[in-house]
């Protein structure tokens, strides 16, 4: 049956654009910047983020369900994404270059988290780098690894302060 493969491609395509919007639309970046603020990438970094940032993939799941894909298949994609996120953020130095144009690797995703000028608007894909290749956001320099992580903005320390950070200019009377 081809439906799971079509669903997978549609899911990945939707997550690519949602993720890209989180970087390119300033109000969304306010939330997503917390995930990118870590200056040392490791598997725990995959869990660092504002709760609203978790809605990043919601459109992809809603799209799958609306398109008639089963809840089971949608759940499999959800679990796969969490597990892959742990792997992609891991502090590993594996040379998986032959795979970079076929599947996302930790090195590919580390470039996405890099705060180096040439890498900032790149590598949004979740599973398949084809979307970055098609839309001009693929970045994998040869024989070089990211040296600088984090963001230019000052993100406060502490969970409460990070929860409030994206809302700081919205006139919230509670703080």
Where are each of the predicted segments found?
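A membrane-cytosol interface segment of integral membrane proteins
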Residues: 146-175
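Membrane-embedded catalytic scaffold of the fatty acid hydroxylase/desaturase
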Residues: 1-147
